[in-house]
Amino acid sequence: LGANEQHYEIVAGSPSIFTPVVTSNSAYMPSNASSSWISLPSGLSSATYQTTFDLTGFDVSSASLDLKIAVDNTMTDVLINGASTGFSIAIGYPAFQSWSNLTVSSKFLAGVNTLQFFAVNSGGPGAFRVEASGNAAAVSEPGAGVLFGLGLMGLAMTRKRKA
């Protein structure tokens, strides 16, 4: 607890930009091995949490990202590569006691992708938590089909010579 969080950075906030830290609060659902609550210094009213992931070598048209999100107090939007998902979590008790689910299946880029979470705190403690899982088909190596085809031709020619 209190250590700098390594997966997210704060790219916008009010009154200033801070590094998020791992936190806990007895009112929140407990952290686990998959995720922990991250927070900002007291008095911060809004923040944009950002993380990146790389889809190099994957077919982006097959990509899907499943997110479980919890927040104290409000999530106003989630962006994938600058495009809004239209996702939000209203202020209220359940927002930090249960998960809200979001599936993203478009707007992915070949290479590095950026996820941004817009969180608003209404005073007192504020925190954010996400668990992510995803799927994408691997892109075959360029020319792998040609090499495979040439290999089959070579196998067929070898069999003809032996016959």
Stretches with model-predicted labels:
Residues 1-64, 117, 121:
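Extended carbohydrate-recognition surfaces in non-catalytic/accessory domains of CAZymes
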Residues 46-48, 95-97, 140:
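Short, solvent-exposed coil/turn segments
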Residues 161-163:
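Short, charged juxtamembrane terminal tails flanking transmembrane helices
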Residues 59, 71-72:
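Short loop/turn positions at the edges of beta-strands in beta-sheet-rich folds
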Residues 70, 76-136:
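Beta-strand-rich ligand-recognition modules
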Residues 140-158:
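A short, hydrophobic C-terminal helix/tail in secreted or cell-surface proteins
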